[in-house]
């Protein structure tokens, strides 16, 4: 679920941040109608800041590195943008350690959903 459904426009270094009033208007109402969420992937700074608050104040890199403290229900991830290729190259542990764990957790969450809703 995105932080905003409206495109905020382009800024000097990429897309502008999602508009705060968009999430304030609809996000809690939408999540209230999804009571069986087993796993939340917090992709990028804005989602991490919204859901983790001060725990995400060190930036995306530090928040993702501390992913174990948010497990098993929330996993902070960097945005998979081409602009982040350098980050992925500087952090090989992400692909070697976090991604295999993430894949297992997603498979487990999907199995739980299929078990509940055959």
Predicted regions and their residues:
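Glycine/proline-rich loop-helix segments at beta-alpha junctions forming the active-site rim
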Residues: 2-118
């Amino acid at each position: 679920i995105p932080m905003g459904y409206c495109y905020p426009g382009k800024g000097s270094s990429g897309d502008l941040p999602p508009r705060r009033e968009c999430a304030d208007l609809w996000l809690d109402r939408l999540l209230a109608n999804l009571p069986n969420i087993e796993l939340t992937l917090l992709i990028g700074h804005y989602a991490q800041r919204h859901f983790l608050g001060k725990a995400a104040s060190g930036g995306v890199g530090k928040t993702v590195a501390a992913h174990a403290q948010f497990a098993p229900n929330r996993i902070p991830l960097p945005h998979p943008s081409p602009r982040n290729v350098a980050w992925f190259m500087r952090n090989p542990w992400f692909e070697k350690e976090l991604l295999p764990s993430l894949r297992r957790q997603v498979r487990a969450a999907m199995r739980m959903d299929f078990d509940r809703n055959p």
